């Protein structure tokens, strides 16, 4: 049991060294938690789920390494002992990842030997050989260990290994020195955690570079004696890619003073690599809790706090690793066109213009703000007067979408100058910059063109444009406005008074409307609004059942009245009042509620009975309620009335006294 506890401590120290290598070691809580998971026989997936909060991206590497170590110990324990004196050697080679300069793979060999006397000998040795290639060296290491089989105990969480009386000397080359014991009861067990530089093939790694090794220090070891040592190395500068080999060695001697600590570090590096930073930490004695288990702090709370801290750190670091892309809002139903598309359109038009014009064509490109203009002057065939070809393209940043229309370029004839309406739009250079930008889709009117005039078609298909949503009325209006705006410009450009004016063809994908054009459009809009009939500020008496809808000249309320029921306008109010529950049957003249059905009479009064002097002949026996004849009103005092001029009716038969009107039960004999 003592040896098993020592092996558990050795595994714990190796786990601690591995955590320090990954930079995830904080205190003893995490190694304790991992040892508990090992004791509970957690599978790699469960360990990866539980340790992902602590190790992050190194979780898979750690779990593969840990289960590789446990699998080796388990395979040694399960292997049956040999009956003969022969020694069975089983070697398992685990290739490690190659470095950037093509280092040799490291091989790990484990040999197990057993004797007839059921004695177990544990000896682990490793030697790091350096093979140089192009000024860089890697150290292939071979680990050989002879281990006695262990008895499986399902209830125990540690592995027991009985010590042998002596150790074997195992060497693979004359350079390797083995650790030999002069005492028969000494047991040497050493485990090393070798840290390697990550390579491109890190995804293929199936086992980590954990090895149990026996590293000798040569003849100096015999002078210093045998001491148990524990070493954990940590690379403080992660930018250095030098491999660091750290050995953790614990030696148990039966007749010596006890356990001692020694730092064993063998680092042989080339000039290409810098000196690796190393930190040697002596193993601390096992802490014993001073409080009973009932009063100790709950480890789950500590682990939860650590996980929350790690999660917050991951969140803060991930915010800066992922670049944030700024998104620019784009208007709906438009698509931002790249500069290449607009330049391609310009080049396409230029090529066709070169085909139509002579070689001495003058190219003059002007860029104003977001609009680019290409002006070409072409000499006339007969009159030798220059013809100006002007191409204006509004860039994508202004249009936010290219036009999908197809337009035709025609060479103007000498006899017939092209009409002014063939322009899509014009820009007055002397005016101020526009305050608003509007999309114009002017229709090219059908013109009779001779068959001899060449033409070519430039189409921009596949690009959505909001220009198609314009109505014909708007396009005609803007076409007329463009015509009026082009007239002054043509008068300024023409220097001759001949009947044949200078033809100019303006081809544009889109254009701006200047302030003058905007003012004219606004005036036309105002006139159109004034042409409509204004609604009268009076509530529609047929509302809410009015059939005219929005065309009704009267006001239809659409907002709740805020002063109801204290509104003094009643049914004349321009706001909505709740419906009256009596609706058309309501007889209240000033009812503030809304009546959906039309009331028959806003102030109904009952018809007064006709005043007739004819006394009903059936009086006072008449039973008809609405009898049109006169029924005298009886006097309340009846025969007791003492007024001589009483106008009420006094019946001739006296009314019996009150006592006579009382009913009494007849007594039965």
From Swiss-Prot:
Zinc finger (C3H1-type): 535-558, 559-579, 580-595, 616-633, 635-652
GO cellular component, as recorded: cytoplasm; nuclear speck; nucleus
Gene3D superfamilies xrefs: 4.10.1000.30, 4.10.1000.40, PWI domain
Stretches with biased composition (Low complexity): 490-500
Role of this protein: RNA-binding protein involved in the biogenesis of circular RNAs (circRNAs), which are produced by back-splicing circularization of pre-mRNAs. Acts by binding to both exon-intron boundary and 3'-UTR of pre-mRNAs to promote circRNA biogenesis through dimerization and the association with the spliceosome. Also binds the poly(A) tail of mRNAs; controlling poly(A) length.
Positions of disulphide bridges: none
Record's subcellular location: Nucleus speckle
PANTHER family xrefs: ZINC FINGER CCCH DOMAIN-CONTAINING PROTEIN 14 (PTHR14738:SF29)
Bias-annotated ranges (Acidic residues): 261-273
Biased composition (Basic and acidic residues): 127-141, 192-208, 217-236
Single GO biological process annotation from the record: regulation of mRNA stability
Entry keyword Oxidoreductase: no
Biased composition regions of type Polar residues, renumbered to the chain: 178-191, 316-327
Superkingdom of the organism of origin: Eukaryota
A molecular-function term among this protein's GO annotations: pre-mRNA binding
Region: Disordered, residue numbers: 81-145, 175-298, 316-337, 460-504
Protein name according to UniProt: Zinc finger CCCH domain-containing protein 14
Quaternary state and interactors: Homodimer; facilitating circular RNAs (circRNAs) formation.
Keywords assigned by UniProt, alphabetized: Metal-binding, Nucleus, Repeat, RNA-binding, Zinc, Zinc-finger
Family, similarity comment: Belongs to the ZC3H14 family.
Location, primary (coarse class): nucleus
